[in-house]
Amino acid sequence: MVNFNQFLKQAQSMQKKMQEAQEQMANTRYTGKAGGMLVEIIITGKGEVEKISIDESLLKTEEKEMLEDLIKVAFNDAKQKCDEDSQNSLSGALNGMSLPPGFKIPF
């Protein structure tokens, strides 16, 4: 049987590591690019858009649909990087603790 005090210490350690990982993620920026850098989006580790840069060549009425597509692609690129980094950070924070199948961390 697992020692309860040992389990409690392990849980507290995991909580501290998770908190540190969340703080690190919140301070990290992810850049997504599309159209060969015609559109660039920077998001925070919380998935919030911080900045959008659009090449002037796309600021024409006839380029509206392409611009919309490029913004979507750039955002998804940045979000994917953020999500991958988040998973890697959390894996390190959990450091060998097994979670139940399907358990997902809420950020």
Swiss-Prot record:
One Pfam annotation reads YbaB_DNA_bd
Q: Does the keyword Cytoplasm apply?
A: yes
Which compartment or compartments is the protein found in? Cytoplasm, Nucleoid
Q: Which residues cross the membrane?
A: none
A GO molecular function for this record? DNA binding
Major localization listed first in the record, in broad terms: cytoplasm
Instruction: List the keywords (alphabetical).
Output: Cytoplasm, DNA-binding
General function of this protein: Binds to DNA and alters its conformation. May be involved in regulation of gene expression, nucleoid organization and DNA protection.
HAMAP family linked to this entry: DNA_YbaB_EbfC
Q: What does the subunit section of this Swiss-Prot or TrEMBL entry state?
A: Homodimer.
Please state what the protein is called. Nucleoid-associated protein RP866
State the species of origin.
Answer: Rickettsia prowazekii (strain Madrid E)
